[in-house]
Regions:
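Glycine-rich phosphate-binding loops at beta-strand->alpha-helix junctions
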Residues: 36, 276-294
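Short glycine-aspartate micro-motif
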Residues: 27-31, 83-85, 165-169, 280
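Glycine-rich phosphate-binding loop plus the immediately following alpha-helix
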Residues: 59, 132-224
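Glycine-rich phosphate-binding/hydrolytic loop that grips phosphoryl groups
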Residues: 303-325
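Active-site rim beta-loop-alpha module in soluble metabolic enzymes
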Residues: 198-257
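Short beta-strand-loop/turn "lid" adjacent to the catalytic site in phosphate-handling enzymes
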Residues: 76-140, 181
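A short, acidic, amphipathic alpha-helical segment used as a generic capping/interface helix at domain edges
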Residues: 247, 251-273
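Short glycine-rich, Thr/Ser-proximal phosphate-binding strand/loop in the N-terminal lobe
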Residues: 27-63
Length: 325
């Protein structure tokens, strides 16, 4: 583990003050992404409570240290917290403390050793590293947070740590990750989630403020068209269908979702990914369900793992190993 870094910002944010009511020791683990913070209080190996807060990318008036101190204050006031372990954007340039990426190929032990350590009063904060790897076009690519889910998946399903596997982690920035014998080898990022948000809220494709219910038929149309035409040629159909055919905003959003997810999945399958057996989808079940439909529609097989269970398993694997460091 990397040497302790300055805790000045954390002390200023309130991490040096801890008034404990419950003498039972606990541990806090956090998945802090760009869009949200998910925190879990664990005692005796059991998740007791959970809470959420703003993502790193949503902070405007608070520093990351101030936001984290505010969100965790109720727990720190009632429990004796031994350590706080964080993954994701907490270790980014705009996070709590910048933790350098661990370069692939990377095993669990190598990734864990790259963690940053911050001590502040009675608190020990461990900020996990991200991964730097070549993508499938031999260009540098990075991720923060998804590696925790991958190593958690190994803990939940040990067979995934054997041989070559391809894991798909949908989200704001979707990741396709090749692992070999339990080591992260390569990764490919797709801008799909953020592109959907931008096109559906800040472009001419959808009416301002238009949402509506999801339409499964429109999603399927998007998947079919994504395999037949270029994405740039497909996109304007979301607007013309509303203007000429009277389609609802919900229908158009579902079409857009199908076009973007379909373009991502179809391009990766065209490379031959998936020919080594079922792909593994990790993430929110609703979102991975959409990717599963896309994969199946193009003739690929996949299994789903719950993203929250994987990130918790990964945070535990990192924390337990660091106790021995």
């Amino acid at each position: 583990m990397r040497a302790p870094v300055s805790s000045t910002l954390l002390i200023a944010a309130g991490f040096s003050r801890q008034f404990v009511v419950n003498d039972v020791s606990g541990r806090i683990v956090c998945d802090w992404g760009g869009s949200r913070l998910r925190a879990f209080l664990e005692t005796g190996g059991v998740i007791r409570e959970r809470c959420s807060g703003p993502g790193i990318g949503q902070l405007e008036k608070e520093s990351p240290a101030e936001a984290l101190a505010r969100v965790l204050a109720p727990w720190r006031a009632h429990w004796r917290i031994g350590r706080i372990v964080l993954c994701g954007m907490a270790g980014s340039r705009n996070g709590l403390v910048e933790v350098p990426y661990v370069r692939a190929p990377a095993s669990l032990a190598q990734w864990r050793a790259g963690a940053g350590l911050v001590r502040s009063g009675a608190d020990t904060l461990i900020v996990l590293a991200g991964i730097e790897a070549q993508n499938f076009r031999d260009v540098a690519d990075v991720m923060r947070g998804e590696e925790t889910q991958i190593f958690g998946a190994f803990a939940l399903e040990p067979s995934l740590a054997a041989g070559r596997q391809v894991m798909v982690l949908p989200g704001t920035h979707s990741k396709w990750v090749e692992v070999r014998d339990g080591r992260i080898a390569r990764l490919q990022t797709y801008f799909t989630g953020e592109l959907f948000e931008l096109l559906s809220t800040r472009s001419s494709l959808l009416r301002a403020g238009g949402t509506g219910e999801a339409d499964e038929e429109a999603f399927e149309v998007g998947l079919r068209n994504a395999a037949r035409f270029d994405l740039a040629a497909n996109l304007f159909e979301t607007r013309s269908a509303q203007l000429i055919e009277g389609r609802s905003a919900g229908w158009a959003r579902s079409l857009l979702s199908g076009l973007l997810i379909g373009a991502e999945v179809h391009s990766m399958l065209a490379r031959g990914e998936g020919q080594f057996g079922p792909l593994t989808l990790i993430g929110d079940p609703a979102l991975t369900g959409r990717y599963l439909r896309a994969l199946c529609s193009y003739g690929a097989e996949a299994r789903q793992l719950d993203g929250e269970l994987c990130v918790l398993a990964g945070l535990r694997a990192a924390s337990e190993g660091l106790q021995e460091s």
